[in-house]
Curated annotation (Swiss-Prot):
GO terms for molecular function: nucleic acid binding. Gene3D superfamilies: 3.40.1350.10. This is UPF0102 protein Krad_1407. PANTHER family: UPF0102 PROTEIN YRAN (PTHR34039:SF1). The lineage of its organism: Bacteria, Bacillati, Actinomycetota, Actinomycetes, Kineosporiales. CDD domains: PoNe_Nuclease. It comes from Kineococcus radiotolerans (strain ATCC BAA-149 / DSM 14245 / SRS30216). Belongs to the UPF0102 family. Transmembrane segments: none annotated. InterPro entries: Restrct_endonuc-II-like, tRNA_endonuc-like_dom_sf, UPF0102_YraN-like. Disulfide bonds: none annotated.
Amino acid sequence: MVHVRAKDAVGQYGERVAVRRLTEAGMTVLDRNWRCRSGEIDVVARDGDCLVVCEVKTRRSVSAGTALEAVTPQKLARLRRLTGEWLAAHPGVNPPRVRLDVVAVTVPERGPATVQHVAGVS
């Protein structure tokens, strides 16, 4: 029997919601949960000629801060390094532009999740 912690289940749900939002916006998802020794990229997508590396943050409430507030400058620096590693691991992908996005998902006790997509965070 596989046991999934509640926090992990919420995170997985948030990633599914984020992927649905990105595809509804016309993006093509190229990779999910890509891992290397340095870390993990939640979602890699293509938006026209732009490669989009997306951090997904999911919260059950905002009492400890919003999901967007959890994306620190250090987290963005790590995401930039991981983007370089992803591109090195995928030599056939040569996008003219690369963008870092954040999708923040809040999953309340009741009601639908709220989703905020911030394109081009720096």
